[in-house]
Structure formats: structure tokens, C-alpha cells
Amino acid sequence: MAKDDSSVRCFQGLLIFGNVIVGMCGIALTAECIFFVSDQHSLYPLLEATDNDDIYGAAWIGMFVGICLFCLSVLGIVGIMKSNRKILLAYFILMFIVYGFEVASCITAATQRDFFTPNLFLKQMLERYQNNSPPNNDDQWKNNGVTKTWDRLMLQDHCCGVNGPSDWQRYTSAFRTANNDADYPWPRQCCVMNSLKEPLNVEACKLGVPGYYHKEGCYELISGPMNRHAWGVAWFGFAILCWTFWVLLGTMFYWSRIEY
């Protein structure tokens, strides 16, 4: 392949452009995954307590992949500009490894969406909220995290339980075991608060008088951010994989035509 051929120069330009896009996508993927693992909504304790926080694992892999894609895109551009077979061979080998990691990250993130069900968070809430009799320190840590997260959610987002206040009445729970039903039909955080973060009317809240307790459940406030992040990591990753596939294919064709 003659390096001074105008068609070759044009093809090189296309491949360089393709790698520039790959590098930019890598930076964007890293930024997205950093935003996700920074846990802006402070929901990680709920996932940690389920012993299945694979979505965070997928995001960490995405961060690694994003950085690698940026670095490898630079390597690919150098190899294309110099028409160096050895540099491009190293580029292919490393890119295929990174490609495999990103496939794993995307599949993990996409499949985790079905994991975020109401029953998952309901079971966890009933077992761990205000549970002060854990079998070991690890469970105590998880129970404390779940309790603090639920307290914050119910206070901050004006909701109660997973599906609503009836969760605390309908099912057996650690909270029900520790508290009298008449005094605590549901946690105080379910009550409408005044400016001092105190129940507006405790008795009315306990009796379930409309306007003095929160009727809405918290499930949408939990699953919404998690699902959005899961789909973001998965589908943006898949889009990057599709683009990278064609860039790799074109670069492999170019590599096969480089003269020894």
C-alpha cells in the first residue's frame, strides 16, 4: 500500500477520526461510571445488604474500560499515522482484551435491571430495618446502613416503606418485633414533619389520619435511579462497542495492506 496515495490518506483520516471518537467515548464512559459509583442518591447500602452489588462492579469495569479506550485510541492513531504494523498489532491485542471486559460490563449492567424488584427491597427492609440482633458484625454493619438509608429516604422524599405504610402492618418485621403496634404502627419518619423535623401530630400520624402521614411508597425513588444508571452503563457501553467494532475492522484491513 503506497503511503502517498490520496485514497490511502483518506482512509487513514477516516480511521483516525474513528479512533478520536473512541477516545472521546472512553472519557465519557469513565465520567458516567464515576458519577454512578459516587452514589449520588446514597442507595449503595441497600444493594450491599442484598449481597448482589454487581451493577457497581459493572460500573467499576466501565471506568477501567473508558480509560483504556482513550489510551488505546491514541496508540491506534500513532500506529495509523506511522503505518507501523507492530504498533497496530499491539493495539489489536490490547483492544480485544478491553473489548471483552466492556462486553462483560454491559451484559452485567443490562441484566441487573430485572433484579431491582419491590419484593427484593421489601424483604430486606423487613429483615434489616432497626434489627439490633444480628448474628455477626457484618450483618450489624448492613443493618445500620439499611436503617440509616431508609430513615433518610422516608424523611427526605416524604414516602413510607416500599409500597406504602401498610408494609409495616401487613408483614412480620424486625421493626414490628422491637416496637409496640399501637405506639409505632410505622416508623416516625413516615409522619409529616414540621420545620424542626418533628412529627406535625404524632397521635394523628399513629391513627393514620390523612395529611399527617405519608401514603406513598419509596420503591420508585429507589429503583428509578438504579435503573437509569444500569441502562446508562449498559446501552452507552453497547453503543461504544458497536462503533469500536467497525473502527477495529477498518484498522485491521488497513494493517493487512501495510507493506513489510
Swiss-Prot record:
Residues 1-12, 82-86, 251-260 are cytoplasmic. The lineage of its organism: Eukaryota, Metazoa, Chordata, Craniata, Vertebrata. Induction: Down-regulated by TGF-beta and serum in quiescent cells. Rapidly and transiently induced by TGF-beta in actively growing cells. It is a multi-pass membrane protein. Heterodimer with uroplakin-3A (UPK3A) or uroplakin-3B (UPK3B). It comes from Neovison vison. The gene is UPK1B. Residues 39-60, 108-229 are extracellular. It comes from the Eukaryota. Its main location: membrane. This is Uroplakin-1b. GO terms for biological process: epithelial cell differentiation; response to bacterium. CDD domains: uroplakin_I_like_LEL. The chain crosses the membrane at residues 13-38, 61-81, 87-107, 230-250. PANTHER family: TESTIS-SPECIFIC EXPRESSED PROTEIN 55 (PTHR47110), UROPLAKIN-1B (PTHR47110:SF2). Belongs to the tetraspanin (TM4SF) family. One of its GO terms (cellular component) is apical plasma membrane urothelial plaque. Component of the asymmetric unit membrane (AUM); a highly specialized biomembrane elaborated by terminally differentiated urothelial cells.
